[in-house]
């Protein structure tokens, strides 16, 4: 049974262009300092929502929502995710997924069930452990990215930018690398202090240069590119 740490009944931002409910899956193997859902990191949460209650809610929303996004945490950590997606799809909803690619093989298993993926690329490959606190996380993430690109599933590739963690040079390096790998839809988004448990990151989030200026230099690399500041 899927472990659910939270549920947003309606969102117009978690899946661009869609009205969706968001199911927050409990558990994540990474420890990103800027995480705005730190309560979802442990494998078990203090206030989990029974999966049957989530399904009951979704039945009441049939015909009112376009889709359901499985977010986290890291949804692909849970081996029950494919069955949960099938149950939601059987109710007539489209399926979205937020993931960092921590489990490439699990990701590959659910891609045939998914209509759209929001995939987080956190750093240049070699610098991943500095962000995630996990050795080998970069290799896992980029293996997951390649599976998404090969699948043909609609997606956007997103990078959260905090000036203490990623320099403009890092962002530019990442953009060129992603374009070379075949990424066509890219977003860079500013760090959000809400929910972040790292006081140092919250205090030192000011940028010397607006993120939009960095973004203007990268627009031509992708079919679609945007900055969420």
Language-model-detected regions and their locations in the chain:
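N-terminal [4Fe-4S]-dependent radical SAM core
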Residues: 1-24, 31-43, 60-61, 223-226
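Conserved beta-strand termini and adjacent loop/short-helix elements that scaffold enzyme active sites
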Residues: 7, 189-191, 227-229
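A secondary-structure boundary/capping signal
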Residues: 24, 71-72
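Short, charged/polar surface micro-motifs in flexible loops or helix N-caps
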Residues: 28-31, 87
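Conserved alpha-helical substructure of the radical SAM core
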Residues: 38-68
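Flexible, glycine- and charge-enriched loops at secondary-structure boundaries
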Residues: 47-51, 134-138, 204-211
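Conserved AdoMet/S-adenosylmethionine-binding subsite of the radical SAM
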Residues: 55-60, 64-67, 76-203
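Short acidic, glycine/proline-enriched helix-loop-strand junctions
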Residues: 195-229
């Amino acid at each position: 049974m899927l472990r659910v740490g939270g549920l947003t009944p309606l969102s117009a931002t978690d899946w661009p262009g869609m009205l969706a409910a968001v199911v927050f899956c409990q558990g994540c193997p990474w420890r990103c300092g800027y995480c705005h859902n730190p309560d979802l990191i442990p494998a078990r949460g203090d206030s989990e929502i029974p999966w049957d209650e989530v399904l009951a809610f979704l039945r009441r929303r049939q015909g009112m929502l376009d889709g359901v996004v499985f977010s986290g945490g890291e949804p692909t950590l849970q081996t029950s995710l494919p069955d949960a997606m099938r149950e939601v799809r059987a109710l007539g909803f489209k399926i979205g997924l937020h993931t960092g690619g921590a489990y490439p093989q699990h990701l590959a298993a659910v891609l045939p069930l998914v209509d759209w993926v929001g995939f987080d690329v956190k750093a240049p490959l070699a610098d991943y452990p500095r962000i995630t606190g996990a050795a080998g996380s970069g290799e896992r993430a980029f293996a997951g990215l390649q599976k998404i690109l090969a699948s043909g599933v609609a997606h956007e590739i997103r990078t959260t930018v905090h000036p203490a963690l990623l320099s403009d040079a890092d962002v530019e390096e990442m953009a060129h690398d992603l374009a070379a790998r075949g990424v066509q839809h890219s977003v860079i988004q500013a760090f959000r202090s809400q929910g972040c448990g790292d006081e140092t990151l919250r205090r030192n989030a000011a940028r010397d240069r607006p993120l939009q200026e960095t973004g203007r230099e990268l627009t031509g690399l992708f079919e679609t590119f945007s900055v969420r500041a």
